Structures are given as C-alpha cells and as structure tokens.
C-alpha cells in the first residue's frame, strides 16, 4: 500500500431503527463507534466524466486503516468529517486488510 497521510478525524454515523409496531424504518443518524484517523481525497471532474457520471455534488474518498469497526461499515451508513455529512456510495478494500476506502457524496454542508 502506498504511503497515505491519515491527517483528519472522521466519525461514522448509523441510522437507528424505529419500530412502531407496524414497520421498522431508519431513524436519525447517530455516532457509531469511535472517531478514526482518515485520509481524504476529492474525486476530480475528469474522473467523474470518465466514469460516465455527471453529478453536481461534492464527491470524496476517505481511506481508513482496516479495523473491525471499518469492516462493519455498510452502504447505508454515513461519514461526518469537518462539519459535513457524506453518504457512502462505494466501499473498497485496499490490500489484504490494510485499509478500507469509502467513496462518498456530500449530503449536508
């Protein structure tokens, strides 16, 4: 794995399930696990264009070291970093349990 600068802290968020007796549905997002050190890189417009997606929002990649917490993160979870909330749109393992990479789209500023 290339040298990565883990220079910011992120918090994973998970929706709490609400059961009203008739159905279960996701509720508010609350912190899940502890804060982790991560590396962040922005996805360039050229990369979006070559992938065939023209999306008018900010897309970023967050890379964290592999851990049981990072391995348990799902597409339905979110990431909070630097006062912004990002929806996870893709998850990739880097190396053999070296790191996990989360492709995200900005949800709230």
Region locations from a protein language model:
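Short, conserved turn/kink motifs that form compact alpha/beta structural patches or helix kinks used as
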Residues: 4, 25-109
């Amino acid at each position: 794995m290339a040298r990565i600068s883990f220079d910011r802290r992120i918090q994973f968020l998970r929706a709490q399930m609400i059961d009203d007796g008739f159905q279960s549905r996701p509720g508010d997002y609350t912190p899940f696990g502890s804060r982790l050190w991560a590396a962040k890189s922005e996805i360039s417009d050229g990369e979006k264009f070559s992938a065939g997606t023209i999306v008018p929002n900010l897309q970023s990649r967050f890379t964290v070291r592999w851990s049981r917490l990072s391995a348990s993160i799902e597409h339905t979870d979110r990431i909070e970093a630097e006062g912004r909330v990002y929806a996870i749109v893709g998850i990739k393992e880097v190396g053999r349990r070296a790191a996990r990479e989360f492709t995200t789209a900005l949800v709230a500023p």
